[in-house]
């Protein structure tokens, strides 16, 4: 019966693991719903900010803000990469890093260098091993990120752009499509892309105090911050969705392993009982 005992021990071990993965699945599902609510709450703010920028720029067309002007030559670009701090979320980070590596190869073909600003321990570790140029690194934002913790690294990248160290700035993060699907997305932060006429839903005829140019300086800064914050919040929702799916898959796989081990255990136990009966019958016949 020693073989049956070993199988029984394995079954108990897998059952304990299954309880853990099931609990993690339920926790991730709860956190995902809260992250989705935050994500949906921040989207209208970012969209309205684009409208405000378009109206302010239109109110003073002679004012050329550096965040709105295309540069003739692009020698270096900055990538703000948002990953997770923890694992157990399937291929979420791997797919994101593959997208970044592809972009790096494309920029390298054009002779353009890349500087990084990373959010999340996974991105910091990956690009650290890669030996990439990292200007700012932030970790430990948690499941409920706060904008105050992001302002520092954002300012580092904005200063690099203002000083001409980088000529474009991009945001790379996971885009929440639905619970089962998350995709790596890249959006240009600087220079800010022109606002489409469709986004300018209303004609504003305001007198600005202070001037439109002064307001534009502050609004552009807030816009960049809101875009990064939106990316971080959306990435949290992606992380929780991916972890929920990964843990559900692990729980289901554990169930299959338990079923297979139970079958092995039953066969081993049946074989042991059959052997004992055979020995008893043989002993009785001998007597």
UniProtKB/Swiss-Prot annotation:
It is a peripheral membrane protein. Keywords: ATP synthesis, Cell inner membrane, Cell membrane, CF(1), Hydrogen ion transport, Ion transport, Membrane, Transport. GO terms for molecular function: ATP binding; proton-transporting ATP synthase activity, rotational mechanism. It is found in: Cell inner membrane. Its main location: membrane. One of its GO terms (cellular component) is plasma membrane. GO terms for biological process: proton motive force-driven plasma membrane ATP synthesis. Transmembrane segments: none annotated. Signal peptide: none annotated. It holds the Pfam family ATP-synt. Produces ATP from ADP in the presence of a proton gradient across the membrane. The gamma chain is believed to be important in regulating ATPase activity and the flow of protons through the CF(0) complex. PANTHER family: ATP SYNTHASE GAMMA CHAIN, ATP SYNTHASE SUBUNIT GAMMA, MITOCHONDRIAL. F-type ATPases have 2 components, CF(1) - the catalytic core - and CF(0) - the membrane proton channel. CF(1) has five subunits: alpha(3), beta(3), gamma(1), delta(1), epsilon(1). CF(0) has three main subunits: a, b and c. This is ATP synthase gamma chain. It comes from Alkalilimnicola ehrlichii (strain ATCC BAA-1101 / DSM 17681 / MLHE-1). The gene is atpG.
């Amino acid at each position: 019966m020693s073989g049956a005992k070993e199988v029984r021990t394995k079954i108990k071990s897998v059952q304990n693991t299954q309880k853990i993965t099931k609990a993690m699945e339920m926790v991730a599902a709860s956190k995902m719903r809260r992250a989705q609510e935050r994500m949906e709450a921040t989207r209208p703010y970012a969209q309205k900010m684009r409208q405000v920028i378009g109206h302010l720029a239109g109110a003073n067309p002679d004012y050329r803000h550096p965040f709105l002007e295309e540069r003739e030559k692009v020698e270096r670009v900055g990538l703000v990469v948002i990953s997770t701090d923890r694992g157990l979320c399937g291929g979420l980070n791997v797919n994101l890093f593959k997208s970044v590596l592809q972009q790096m190869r494309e920029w390298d073909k054009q002779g353009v260098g890349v500087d990084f600003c990373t959010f999340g321990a996974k991105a910091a570790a990956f690009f650290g091993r890669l030996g990439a140029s990292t200007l700012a690194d932030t970790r430990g934002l948690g499941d409920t990120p706060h904008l105050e913790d992001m302002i520092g690294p954002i300012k580092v990248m904005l200063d690099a752009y203002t000083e001409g160290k980088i000529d474009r700035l991009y945001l790379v993060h996971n885009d929440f499509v639905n619970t089962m699907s998350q995709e790596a997305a890249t959006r240009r932060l600087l220079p800010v892309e022109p606002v489409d006429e469709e986004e300018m839903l209303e004609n504003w005829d305001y007198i600005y105090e202070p001037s439109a140019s002064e307001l534009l300086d502050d609004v552009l800064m807030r816009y960049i911050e809101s875009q990064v914050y939106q990316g971080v919040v959306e990435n949290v929702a992606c992380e929780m969705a991916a972890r929920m799916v990964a843990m559900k898959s692990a729980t289901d796989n554990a169930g299959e392993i338990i079923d297979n081990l139970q079958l092995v255990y039953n066969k081993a136990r049946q074989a042991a009982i059959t052997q004992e009966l055979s020995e008893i019958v043989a002993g009785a016949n001998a007597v």
